[in-house]
């Protein structure tokens, strides 16, 4: 057997020794001369018009260096479709949305300054249910409506084959509803960022970001500077899982640094802020309908999914599209119809988290397999083997598949788990499809 250098070997983590010796340097460990500290006034309600913002008392507090509102942000929009304000302007869309930011000599002063800010809100009825958000007379979260668009359509559609004809042919029609809950990433290290603008006007950012180039792409227009004048230095990420793809602290710190006469500003979120204001995995509703033959073949699948998109778009369209691609699972289903919607609500924004929509699809898909097995009286392992993709099959998007290995992986998993498979399953291969 060929000896490999890495494959099959237990290798030490390159950063393991630094971690166990407590020598790893995180963004919060950075101390710079003249450091200022940031806190923000956040919305206490999920939906409201902003009638008045008075920061005069906060500005006059000794130790406060700068207080900013949206009027101080050179360009107050970011995101892939630039719908998200750095600081809220005339409305708030979720509890915890930043309206005013303060930079002060110390954290206590920054917190006191926030308590002196007077914001008058006209509270509105919030939209909290994405299913209700699809109704014609629903509360509108955005002036453009509640539907997140995929190109020029408010739905991501996938069509393969003729599902209506296949359902008419099927021996069983099996329908189920699945719902996955919202989920917080809970990184051990909460959001943290440091920014400093030097005498040449170049803004330097110490970032824990998982997506530094996204930050750079968004920061340059926000600051109205070329990208060459935005310098982002990545650090060790103390747990991210997708939450640190979004620039929770970097944008506001960078804007504040424009006004602090070259002094660095730092913002470390509390655990409460992490829970209430960071992006998270949104909940999803999934309606599955499968057409199944007595021999276990799934010949048709129809899925309607609705994702709770939170207050702004961010990566919602991408996550919705990936979810749509994934609802057929690793199975060869000849007829597929998928409609995936993302609906804005008055909740904190949702964004990337491990799997980008595929986790929800896989959960529903595999539970559906178990329910099919129970309905038709067949072992669920056998159903998975019968329907597993083979080389030459096509995906739900009609891409031809190669290098398939699901059958071999299931055979190995069963062996390791001590599960005895029938002989006909052990002779199956991902390279050739045998008659059932």
Q: Which residues make up each language-model segment?
A:
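Structural alpha/beta core scaffold segments of enzyme domains
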Residues: 1-436
């Amino acid at each position: 057997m060929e000896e490999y250098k890495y494959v099959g070997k237990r290798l030490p983590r390159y950063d393991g020794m630094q971690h166990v010796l407590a020598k790893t340097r995180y963004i919060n460990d950075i101390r710079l001369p003249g450091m200022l500290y940031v806190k923000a006034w956040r919305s206490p309600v999920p939906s409201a018009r902003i009638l008045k913002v008075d920061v005069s008392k906060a500005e006059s507090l000794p130790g406060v260096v700068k207080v900013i509102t949206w009027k101080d942000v050179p360009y107050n929009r970011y995101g892939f479709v630039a719908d998200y304000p750095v600081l809220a302007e005339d409305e708030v869309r979720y509890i915890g949305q930043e309206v005013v930011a303060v930079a002060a000599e110390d954290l206590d002063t920054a917190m006191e300054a926030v308590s002196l800010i007077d914001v008058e809100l006209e509270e509105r009825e919030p939209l909290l249910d994405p299913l209700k958000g699809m109704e014609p007379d629903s509360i509108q979260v955005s002036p453009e409506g509640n539907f997140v668009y995929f190109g020029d359509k408010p739905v991501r559609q996938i069509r393969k084959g003729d599902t209506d004809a296949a359902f008419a042919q099927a021996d069983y029609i099996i329908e189920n509803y699945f719902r996955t809950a919202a989920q917080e990433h809970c990184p051990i290290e909460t959001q943290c960022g440091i920014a400093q603008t030097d005498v040449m006007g170049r803004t330097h950012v110490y970032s824990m970001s998982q997506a530094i180039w996204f930050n750079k792409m968004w920061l340059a227009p926000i600051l109205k500077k070329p990208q060459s004048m935005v310098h982002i230095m990545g650090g060790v990420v103390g747990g991210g899982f997708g939450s640190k793809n979004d620039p929770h602290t970097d944008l506001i710190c960078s804007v504040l640094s424009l006004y602090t006469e070259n002094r660095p500003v730092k913002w470390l979120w509390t655990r409460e802020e992490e829970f209430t204001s960071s992006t998270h995995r949104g909940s999803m509703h999934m309606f599955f309908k499968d057409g199944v033959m007595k021999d276990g073949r799934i010949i048709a699948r129809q899925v309607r999914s609705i994702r709770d998109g939170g207050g702004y778009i961010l990566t919602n369209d991408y996550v919705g599209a990936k979810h749509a691609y994934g609802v057929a699972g690793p199975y060869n289903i000849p007829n597929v119809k998928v409609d995936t919607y993302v609906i804005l609500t008055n909740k904190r924004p949702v964004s990337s988290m491990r799997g980008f929509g595929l986790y929800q699809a896989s959960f529903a898909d595999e539970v559906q397999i178990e329910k099919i097995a129970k309905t038709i009286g067949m072992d669920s392992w056998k159903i998975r083997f019968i329907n597993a993709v083979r080389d030459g099959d096509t995906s739900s998007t009609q891409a031809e598949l190669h290098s398939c290995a699901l059958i071999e992986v299931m055979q190995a998993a069963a062996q390791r788990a001590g599960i005895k498979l029938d002989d006909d399953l052990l002779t199956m291969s991902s390279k050739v499809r045998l008659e059932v």
